[in-house]
Amino acid sequence: MNTFNKNYWDKKYKEHKTGWDIGDISSPLKSYIDQLTNKNLRILIPGAGNGYEVEYLFRLGFTNIFVVDIALQPLKNIQKRIPNFPKENLIHSNFFDHYEKYDLILEQTFFCALHPTLRSTYANKMVELLNKNGKLVGLLFDFELTENGPPFGGNIIKYIQIFYSNFEIKILEKCYNSIKPRKGRELFFIFEKK
């Protein structure tokens, strides 16, 4: 099955079959965002789903937040929850067709939803979308990669192989503040574009 299919994802959201949705911003991303001081950063959240990170950033006064999602329903959900959020910043498109530039890209369960054959393409696309010294920051699952996803897992060694040629790996380590159901199964990372 091609999991990167807008009908598949729209159906999941319409039927509320979103077991990955924790209903709030994840504590690791909240902690990272809380230490950001530049509210003018251009921030992209690809495959944001219901976009709790978007809502958190917006309420903190960040002004340049963008979401790209192949599924329309989660974008509608964000707009409904945050009516003042700029509608033009909710981009209904295939991530791989997106061509803007950003200072920061936040990763929260998008990478793990892509089939593993797309991982190198994902890494290359992230480099393309980031400004010089831009950062890709977020969470990756730390469990054995199988074909039984999404979610698709991986490990530190696999992730280094995917990202090291284009990124300086600042941090890639076991996440100390994961939510209980994901404890011991997540890696927090900060990758800076070379």
Model-identified regions with their sequence ranges:
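Class I (Rossmann-like) S-adenosyl-L-methionine-dependent methyltransferase catalytic domain
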Residues: 1-100, 114-194
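Conserved acidic residues
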Residues: 103
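A conserved beta-strand element that flanks and buttresses the S-adenosyl-L-methionine
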Residues: 106
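Short catalytic micro-motifs in class I SAM-dependent methyltransferases
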Residues: 109, 113
